[in-house]
Amino acid sequence: MQESGYLRFQLLQEVGIVILQRYNFPHPITCFPCVNDDGRYDIIATGSLLGVQGYGQDEKKQWTRKPIGQERGSNSVPVGYEQIVEMYPLDFEEFLWANNMNEEIINVLKHCLEEETPVPSGIHVAMKTLLYRYVAVGGMPAAVNALIETGNMGKVNDVWNSLLKEYRSDMVKYADDKDKPHIRACFNAVPKQLAKENKKYQWSKVESGGRGVYYKDSLQWLEDADIIRRCYNSNITGLPLEGNAIDNVFKVYTADIGMLVAMLGGTTRADILQGNLGGFKGAIFENLMADTLIKKGQSLYYFQKDSGLELDFLIRYKGECVPIEVKAKSAQAKSFSTIRKHPEKYGIKHFIKFGDYNVGRDGDLLTLPTYMQFLLDLEPEEVILETIDTDELTRMAREFLDQK
């Protein structure tokens, strides 16, 4: 590792140049195009999401959000020279790898999903056990390492207590003074927002008398830091999900399931591992589904009407809008049943329900064990366009003109 007056960097002969915390050192960033054109080295530059989202130091050395397009001014990298790759905590599949689950085992799960056949009993039981461990621990590498190396949930608690302190410290360090108390209030309110029967995020539940005008920038800061993620209400059950979303009606989930569990404190991890989830189990397993979708790079949507009709999540799956219901145990929500009875009204052909099941199908409803969430293929459908034969069009044009 080498240091200069500007930045810390590491020169790797086989890889290239690694720059740490790139947004703390804006001036050398302008050299990226020159090094790229030179062709001898690749550059890997790390930085926080706050930097990527345009939060930077102003002339008073305070962190502020700058207008889009002016994030770094003359210190920005020209378009075409930079590819931003967002990193996430471990998802459940990566957690399985960390627990020495090999591809043969995962391929059995994939086969059972594709063929819609039950998972063999021994594998099914083991996967449920590992899923509950993932819910209790989350995907932060330090927490997963503590579990793998010691098997001691007390060590996992210590890691998460430290992480929560660091997150709250960053809220003070990198935010405007006027936003600091509001950011913490929004963050601390997440568990009680999810504990409500109606999980719509309500500003009045952040603090007594709270209003969006005071907190909306603070909630945006938390989302830009990838601490939380909003799940927007869609006014119809159809595509495109983004186009049908209602901007000011949303739920809020933590970006990693382990963070929500850590915020609940006490004996929550032990309760999860023992199956004693109590009244909060619905919120935990909804957040687990959000965790899965977030780490697949998906935006979050749900459906709710004033009548109380609600679907936990809406996803684009195999070219269709598909509702997802998430249950900690074996049950089915009334709303899910109502919409299944009226497919012509809601335009829904297929439904997916995750819960304490093995793989099964009941007509339009695919029931899956919760541990299979990570297997959903949410990549955009591949569209290959036919080549237009311009030579043939030219021939046709000439024939047409010759007739005139």
Regions found by a protein language model. Give the residues of each.
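Catalytic cores of nucleic-acid endonucleases
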Residues: 328-371
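Conserved catalytic/switch belt of AAA+ P-loop NTPases
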Residues: 28-51
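Conserved P-loop NTPase "ATPase switch" module shared by AAA+ and STAND
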Residues: 1, 8-22, 26-28
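Domain-level recognition of nuclease-like catalytic cores that cleave nucleotide substrates
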Residues: 358-404
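Interdomain motor-coupling "hinge/lid" segment immediately C-terminal to the ATP-binding subdomain
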Residues: 47, 53-195
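Structural motif
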Residues: 320-322, 350
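Short glycine-/polar-rich loops that comprise or flank the Walker A/P-loop
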Residues: 39-41, 78-83, 298, 347-350
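Accessory nucleic acid-recognition modules appended to NTPase machines
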Residues: 133, 140, 145-311, 315-318
